[in-house]
């Protein structure tokens, strides 16, 4: 009945007296008052005098400033919450706030009335002791110091990095869960990141057992069922320190054109829907790359074993075979379950050196012609995309390496031609797969970059004008690309790229 009453208030959009409710719904006075009182207690209705009306409340995540004020993040615009009105909420908590009448500045403001969902159950921080009491100094900014229960802290020193379980209430406190290390050593920071985001560092025993049960040899019947690409010069290009190789490529010259093959490791053959491996991969979502450490989505037997396209070993793949004309128009596309035997494992460094005019290592010299052709084709593909209005953001990529003594090194990734080769081929394959899914009405996950709305574009025009770049009044992809290219090598290049990306 309460939901029915609530819908009635929403539909009419005005206050109602108790007598109106009694007449409209034919309720007993005691029953009606009980339902209305419950709705008031739930924060859904308010009572003023003899009238009941919908509570003017909003829900959203709370951001807090160190000075005590905050904002409830809302799609229609953030709601300001003054100091002293944030309740017991912490940054990131999902809260319900009452919207108050506009103040002197003419803007409404809010009062946090309750926390709907906490943003965190655990905290990572540094252990401290004061006046005989243990405290956690959280890593996250704007979080309060948290008193700790003494259990589990025996033998730990001030400055230890730990993980605690947070117990909310009038007087929040934490209980010890795990010791991460001392100070700010890189390995301690890595453990802190794993703990903070709840990453799954280890595989459950039953998942590992399921992985171990997967045979290393491919059954003969499975090989016969698939298209055989083992006679082609299929190879991989990856980073120097890559451990798993999940995509491979090949190219062939055809009369009047070319054939490009993009071969992706067929993980779905080994990870069956609903299996323990599938469930664990679902929980992980992705492999996580940390400095000096990888948390793979699948156990090593798969990620570095049967699903890694290593040279000289038969591997199952899903392949996209694209026939192109001389001017790079798609003439024919085939999707196949296949088997490959990679002939080489190249690195971005080797391919970049080759693109700059140096030779390939002797053992890979037989791929020189294929590589030369692929570099030419993918360069032309890229130029074609840019002519059609695609945007090219030249954000530098940086790799983080950890030295033997724990020192961090930031190493720019400087293999633009080699990486562009792979990027163009993956873009081609993904676009053709997406077109196939749309044509067949099949469900799929699409990554879409929407065009800027005119208001955002106008703000971008004004911002770039202050930097000396002119954009036309009407949105134009070519004009945006022209501005990006004009800023290359100039001090404002990252600012221009960032503004265009944010628009």
Regions found by a protein language model. Give the residues of each.
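Charge-lined substrate channels and their catalytic hotspots, especially those that engage the 3′ end
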Residues: 1-264, 268-314, 345, 349-355, ...
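A sequence-level detector of short linear motifs
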Residues: 80-81, 332, 409-410
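Short loop/turn segments at secondary-structure transitions that flank enzyme active sites
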Residues: 142, 180-182, 243, 267-268, ...
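Short, well-ordered loop/turn elements at secondary-structure boundaries
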Residues: 230-231, 244-245, 253-258, 284, ...
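Short, flexible loop/turn elements at secondary-structure junctions
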Residues: 238-241, 253-255, 264, 294, ...
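Conserved catalytic alpha/beta cores of large enzymes that bind or transform nucleotide phosphates
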Residues: 288-387
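Append "with occasional cross-activation on large, charged helical scaffolds in nucleic-acid assemblies
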Residues: 335, 348-350, 360, 364-503
């Amino acid at each position: 009945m309460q939901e029915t009453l609530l819908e009635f208030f929403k539909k009419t959009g005005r206050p109602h007296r108790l007598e109106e409710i009694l007449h409209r719904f034919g309720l007993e006075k005691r029953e009606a008052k009980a339902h209305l009182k419950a709705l008031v207690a739930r924060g859904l209705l308010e009572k003023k005098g003899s009238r009941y009306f919908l509570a003017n409340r909003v829900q959203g995540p709370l951001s807090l400033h160190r000075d005590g004020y905050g904002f409830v993040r809302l799609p229609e615009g953030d709601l300001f919450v003054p100091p002293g009105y944030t309740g017991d909420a912490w940054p990131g908590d999902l809260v319900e706030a009452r919207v108050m009448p506009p103040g002197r500045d003419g803007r409404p403001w809010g009062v946090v009335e309750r926390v709907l969902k906490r943003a965190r159950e655990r905290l990572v921080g540094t252990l401290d002791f004061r006046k005989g009491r243990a405290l956690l100094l959280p890593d996250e900014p704007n979080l309060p110091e948290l008193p700790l229960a003494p259990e589990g802290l025996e033998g730990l020193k001030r400055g230890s990095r730990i993980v605690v379980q947070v117990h909310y209430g009038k007087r929040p406190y934490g209980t010890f869960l795990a010791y991460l290390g001392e100070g700010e050593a890189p390995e301690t920071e890595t453990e802190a990141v794993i703990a903070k985001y709840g990453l799954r560092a280890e595989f459950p025993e039953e998942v590992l057992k399921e992985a171990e049960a997967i045979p290393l040899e491919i059954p003969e019947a499975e090989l016969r069922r698939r298209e055989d690409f083992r006679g082609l010069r299929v190879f991989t290009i990856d980073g120097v320190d890559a451990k798993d190789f999940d995509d491979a490529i090949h190219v062939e010259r055809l009369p009047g054109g070319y054939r490009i093959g993009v071969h992706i490791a067929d993980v779905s053959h080994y990870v069956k829907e609903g299996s323990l491996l599938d469930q664990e991969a679902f929980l992980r979502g992705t492999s996580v790359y940390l400095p000096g450490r990888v948390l793979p989505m699948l156990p090593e037997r798969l990620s570095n074993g049967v699903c890694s396209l290593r040279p000289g070993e038969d591997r199952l793949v899903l392949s996209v075979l694209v026939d192109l004309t001389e001017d790079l128009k798609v003439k024919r596309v085939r999707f196949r379950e296949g088997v490959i035997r990679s002939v080489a494992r190249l690195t971005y460094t080797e391919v970049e050196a080759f693109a700059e005019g140096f030779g390939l290592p002797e053992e890979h010299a037989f791929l020189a012609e294929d590589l030369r052709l692929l570099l030419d084709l993918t360069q032309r593909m890229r130029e074609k995309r840019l002519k059609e209005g695609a945007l090219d953001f030249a954000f530098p990529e940086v790799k983080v390496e950890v030295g033997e003594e724990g020192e961090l090194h930031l190493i720019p990734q400087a293999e633009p031609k080699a990486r562009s080769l792979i990027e163009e081929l993956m873009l081609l394959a993904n676009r053709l797969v997406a077109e196939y899914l749309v044509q067949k009405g099949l469900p799929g996950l699409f990554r879409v970059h929407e065009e800027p709305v005119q208001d955002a574009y106008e703000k971008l025009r004004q911002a770039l004008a202050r930097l000396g770049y002119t954009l036309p009044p009407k949105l134009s992809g070519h004009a945006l690309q022209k501005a990006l290219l004009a800023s290359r090598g100039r001090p404002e290049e990252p600012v221009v790229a960032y503004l265009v990306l944010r628009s």
